[in-house]
């Protein structure tokens, strides 16, 4: 996720975080009220009803959810598990867990059916990064990382192989405030692309998680103000495009909803960004093209609270 700012810094929507004079605040509030009264309020996203059949009419047989929880323990305190129980996925993928496996909250054992649980976290950085994969069905095989030491120190990738597909959940490195990790991010993108291409050559692939990039201008509220910010630099967008082409993979949400605006999965905690829907689409389900005939729906659960990201859900008819 894009890093949170400080007072006087540039915010995720491109505005400078300043304290306005009271007179200016009053005028701004009045203008806002006038706009909302005229039906010109925040542009919100309404998740349409779930489509649970494939293009050929086959009913969905698999439901996968992915959520950047921004800290597993805090997310549980914010009732994130209540949403999971209601959504009832077959597989749940979590990113930015910030929790080592030996300190996992006991509440995770209460999740109905998701008894096969796999976790990865940095060995030397408590409270940083981390991913989890929880499944009803036992995978054929589970592995961790992408097989390159430089990129496997931060607990960012879990791979689970099932009968008809391989699932990868990832928390892709952020380029950082001031783009201090952009060069590393570019090396990661190249290595990750090679790794995924190898997986996809053997079995259809599903990649999900916080990929830390808004691919196109439609995927964030203020593209013009963020072209030099982490998550929307030309280098990151190009890297994402190369990933789609080289593996190859399809963006499941844009495949189904190519022109749907205001569909975001991340909002900074600052400046009431979520209530205004000033957000970014950073979380994805990417699929091998051979799985598109099985694609029923790709959902953004924007009303689910508990993190600065919202969960996303994929339906497949396998």
Swiss-Prot record:
Region of interest called Necessary for interaction with YBX1, binding to RNA, association together with NPM1 to rRNA, endoribonuclease activity on abasic RNA and localization in the nucleoli, as start-end residue ranges on this chain: 1-33
Site (Important for catalytic activity): 283
Modified residues (Phosphothreonine): 233
Bias type Basic and acidic residues, positions: 16-38
Region of interest called Disordered, as start-end residue ranges on this chain: 1-60
GO biological process, one term: base-excision repair
Coiled-coil regions, chain positions: none
Subcellular location: Nucleus; Nucleus, Nucleolus; Nucleus speckle; Endoplasmic reticulum
Enzyme class: hydrolase
Regulation: NPM1 stimulates endodeoxyribonuclease activity on double-stranded DNA with AP sites, but inhibits endoribonuclease activity on single-stranded RNA containing AP sites.
Positions of short motif Nuclear localization signal (NLS): 8-13
Annotated keywords: Acetylation, Activator, Cleavage on pair of basic residues, Cytoplasm, Disulfide bond, DNA damage, DNA recombination, DNA repair, DNA-binding, Endonuclease, Endoplasmic reticulum, Exonuclease, Hydrolase, Magnesium, Metal-binding, Mitochondrion, Nuclease, Nucleus, Phosphoprotein, Repressor, RNA-binding, S-nitrosylation, Transcription, Transcription regulation, Ubl conjugation
Reaction catalyzed: a deoxyribonucleotide-2'-deoxyribose-5'-monophosphate-DNA + H2O = a 5'-end 2'-deoxyribose-5'-monophosphate-DNA + a 3'-end 2'-deoxyribonucleotide-DNA + H(+); Exonucleolytic cleavage in the 3'- to 5'-direction to yield nucleoside 5'-phosphates; a 3'-end 2'-deoxyribonucleotide-3'-phosphoglycolate-DNA + H2O = 2-phosphoglycolate + a 3'-end 2'-deoxyribonucleotide-DNA + H(+); a 3'-end 2'-deoxyribonucleotide-8-oxoguanine-DNA + H2O = 8-oxo-dGMP + a 3'-end 2'-deoxyribonucleotide-DNA + H(+)
Pfam families with a match to the protein in the record: Exo_endo_phos
Residue positions where S-nitrosocysteine is found in the record: 65, 93, 310
Motif Nuclear export signal (NES) per UniProt: ranges: 64-80
GO cellular component: cytoplasm; endoplasmic reticulum; mitochondrion; nuclear speck; nucleolus; nucleoplasm; nucleus
Binding positions for Mg(2+) 1 per the UniProt entry: 70, 96, 308
Modified sites of kind Phosphoserine: 54
Location (main, coarse): nucleus
Record note on domains: The N-terminus contains the redox activity while the C-terminus exerts the DNA AP-endodeoxyribonuclease activity; both function are independent in their actions. An unconventional mitochondrial targeting sequence (MTS) is harbored within the C-terminus, that appears to be masked by the N-terminal sequence containing the nuclear localization signal (NLS), that probably blocks the interaction between the MTS and Tom proteins.
Note: The specific activity of the cleaved mitochondrial endodeoxyribonuclease appears to be about 3-fold higher than of the full-length form. Extract of mitochondria, but not of nuclei or cytosol, cleaves recombinant APEX1 to generate a mitochondrial APEX1-sized product.
NCBIfam families noted in UniProt: exoDNase_III, xth
Subunit structure: Monomer. Homodimer; disulfide-linked. Component of the SET complex, composed of at least APEX1, SET, ANP32A, HMGB2, NME1 and TREX1. Associates with the dimer XRCC5/XRCC6 in a DNA-dependent manner. Interacts with SIRT1; the interaction is increased in the context of genotoxic stress. Interacts with HDAC1, HDAC2 and HDAC3; the interactions are not dependent on the APEX1 acetylation status. Interacts with XRCC1; the interaction is induced by SIRT1 and increased with the APEX1 acetylated form.
Protein name, as recorded: DNA repair nuclease/redox regulator APEX1
């Amino acid at each position: 996720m894009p890093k949170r700012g400080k007072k006087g810094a540039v915010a995720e929507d491109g505005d400078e975080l300043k304290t306005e004079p009271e007179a200016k605040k009053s005028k701004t509030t009045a203008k806002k009220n006038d706009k909302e009264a005229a039906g010109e309020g925040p542009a919100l996203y309404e998740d349409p009803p779930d489509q649970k059949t494939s293009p050929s009419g086959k009913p969905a047989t698999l439901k996968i959810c992915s959520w950047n929880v921004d800290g597993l323990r805090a997310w549980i305190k914010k009732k994130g598990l209540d949403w999971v129980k209601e959504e009832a996925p077959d597989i749940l993928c979590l990113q930015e867990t910030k929790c080592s496996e030996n300190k996992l909250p006991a509440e995770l054992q209460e999740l109905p059916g998701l008894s096969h649980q796999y976790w990865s976290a940095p060995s030397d950085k408590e409270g940083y990064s981390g991913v989890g994969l929880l499944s009803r069905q036992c995978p054929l095989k589970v592995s961790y990382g992408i097989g390159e030491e430089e990129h496997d120190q931060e607990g960012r990738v879990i791979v689970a192989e099932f009968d008809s597909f391989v699932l990868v959940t990832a928390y892709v490195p952020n380029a950082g405030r001031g783009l201090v990790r952009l060069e590393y991010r570019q090396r990661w993108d190249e290595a990750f692309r090679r790794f995924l291409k190898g997986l996809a050559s053997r079995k259809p692939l599903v990649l999900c998680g916080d990929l830390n990039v808004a691919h196109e201008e439609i995927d964030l509220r203020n593209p013009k103000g963020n072209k030099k910010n982490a998550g929307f630099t030309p280098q990151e967008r190009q890297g994402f495009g190369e990933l789609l082409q080289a593996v190859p993979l399809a963006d499941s949400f844009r495949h189904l909803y190519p022109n749907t605006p205001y569909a975001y999965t991340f909002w900074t905690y600052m400046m009431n960004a979520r209530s205004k829907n000033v957000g970014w689409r950073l979380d994805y389900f990417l699929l091998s093209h051979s799985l598109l005939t099985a694609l029923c729906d790709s959902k953004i659960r924007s009303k689910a609270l508990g993190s600065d990201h919202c969960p996303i859900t994929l339906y497949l008819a396998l």
